[in-house]
């Protein structure tokens, strides 16, 4: 049996203060009213809101923003082969050289960067000795650049230590080394979605063991983010769709996180509003609607700031494992899960209450309803607002051409069913799980994965209450 008292005020009669006793140990009299009980309240931790020192935005801001590097000597640009071979790096190199900087380019980053690639980039850095590292590209070049930055500044680090999980990023067992002694980090996104240019996160894969190391610490936050929408005007439609829904997921999870606060809320809501108004046109019209492209690019960054401080939830926990196991793009994996995650989190009676000092009761329904109202959706109750929010997300995915299920995305059924138990276990142990508004059971994560595989709407399944011996006979 589950008993919740989230909305009950303390009773004046059920027990007294320091004298002990309870309401049935003796008749309650006037003396008990004098002995006031002390009601324990949760103490809230100090919160924070961290972001890069400088964020430049608006189309064409790149040359002006790079003037911040005028006092630097050597810049190592980290990018991928496609951007390098198609001229996306040329303008940046030209601007930096005009300012008197020596420039070298590492362009061998691929999707899901590996330690081998990062070490190759590190060899170039150690020989060149840059005082600026500039990541140019999507999430993969930024991840590679951030990890290389750590290894360049602190060759003694062990990734097992850096990847150690924590409940509070400020109170981790392993203290992250101080960054920025040798070089500063500049991030220039050429895709709209990851928000990595403003976040303290990076992921690298050990190609030998297959282990993914998710690294999280505010020391990894870039010093400068340059959000120039001119760099995303010609993004292909598939990348626009996957990146856009990734940004939507970032904002949704940040808003309902147990660590959400007044500062991150505003950014999550604004990001969702911009995405609702502009993502469909950005996808359908591309460079023919430059304003929509720019607003989606800004929304991606704003959502990044929100989840950099409020963190994410079980949608990302499962997407990390699903994408890695079946080679699905991260944004696509999120898209295949987010609708059912909303349904799962919108529960007034969770199986297990999440543990965080400022999160004193389930707020999933209330918070999702607030999002729906902010987006202008219409309903008559909070639960109906949640349904309307899911309908909007599903409608957006349909416009973007995203498959309706994991199965429709091409994942083999037998292979998925053979691995779903391990996926659920690994997702439970993911760093993102702790900030989810509903603390999950592994069995619940498995059900979410199964429902999402077949494209079924998640619904709560309650186990029957255990019967007392003889109860069934009496019935």
Task: List PLM regions with ranges.
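Glycine/threonine-rich beta-strand-loop-alpha-helix active-site module
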Residues: 116-230
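Carboxylate- and glycine-rich phosphate/diphosphate-binding segment that chelates Mg2+/Mn2+
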Residues: 198-310
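Gly/Pro-rich interdomain helix-loop hinge
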Residues: 328-415, 458-470, 475
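Short, amphipathic C-terminal "tail helix"
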Residues: 415-475
């Amino acid at each position: 049996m589950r008993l919740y008292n989230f909305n009950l005020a303390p009773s004046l009669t059920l027990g007294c203060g320091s004298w002990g006793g309870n309401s049935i140990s003796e008749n309650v009299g006037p003396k008990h009213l004098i002995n006031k009980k002390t009601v324990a309240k949760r103490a809230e931790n100090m919160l924070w809101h961290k972001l890069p020192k400088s964020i430049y935005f608006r189309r064409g801001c790149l040359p002006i923003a790079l003037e911040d590097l005028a006092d630097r000597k050597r810049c190592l640009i980290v990018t991928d082969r496609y951007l390098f071979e198609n001229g996306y790096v040329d303008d940046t190199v030209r601007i930096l050289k005009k300012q008197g900087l020596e420039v070298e380019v590492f362009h061998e980053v691929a999707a899901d960067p590996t330690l081998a690639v990062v070490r190759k980039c590190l060899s170039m850095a150690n020989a060149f000795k840059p005082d600026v590292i500039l990541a140019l590209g999507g999430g993969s070049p930024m991840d590679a650049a951030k990890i290389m930055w750590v290894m360049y500044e602190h060759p003694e680090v062990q990734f097992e230590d850096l990847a150690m999980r924590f409940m509070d990023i400020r109170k981790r067992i392993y203290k992250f080394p101080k960054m920025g002694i040798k070089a500063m980090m500049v991030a220039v996104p050429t895709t709209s979605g990851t928000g990595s240019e403003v976040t303290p996160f990076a992921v690298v894969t050990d190609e030998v063991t297959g282990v993914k190391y998710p690294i999280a610490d505010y020391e990894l936050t870039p010093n400068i983010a340059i959000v120039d929408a001119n760099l995303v005007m010609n993004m292909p439609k598939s990348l626009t769709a996957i990146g856009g829904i990734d940004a939507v997921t970032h904002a949704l999870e940040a808003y309902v996180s147990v660590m959400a606060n007044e500062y991150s809320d505003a950014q999550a809501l604004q990001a969702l509003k911009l995405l609702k108004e502009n993502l469909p046109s950005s996808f359908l019209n591309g460079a023919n609607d430059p304003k929509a492209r720019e607003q989606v690019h800004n929304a991606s960054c704003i959502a990044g700031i929100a989840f950099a401080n409020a963190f994410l939830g079980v949608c990302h926990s499962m997407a990390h494992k699903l994408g890695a196991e079946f080679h699905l793009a991260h944004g696509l994996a999120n898209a295949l899960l987010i609708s059912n995650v909303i349904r799962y989190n919108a529960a007034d009676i969770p199986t297990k209450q999440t543990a965080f000092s400022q999160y004193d009761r389930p707020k999933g329904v209330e918070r999702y309803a607030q999002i729906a109202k902010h987006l202008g959706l219409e309903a008559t109750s909070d639960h109906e607002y949640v349904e309307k929010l899911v309908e909007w997300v599903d409608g957006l995915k349909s416009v973007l051409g995203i498959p309706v299920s994991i199965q429709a995305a091409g994942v083999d059924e037998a292979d998925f069913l053979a691995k779903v138990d391990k996926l659920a276990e690994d997702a439970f142990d993911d760093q993102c799980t702790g900030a989810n508004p509903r603390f999950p059971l592994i069995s619940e994560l498995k059900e979410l994965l199964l429902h999402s595989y077949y494209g079924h709407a998640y619904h709560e399944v309650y186990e029957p209450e255990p019967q007392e011996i003889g109860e069934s006979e009496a019935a």
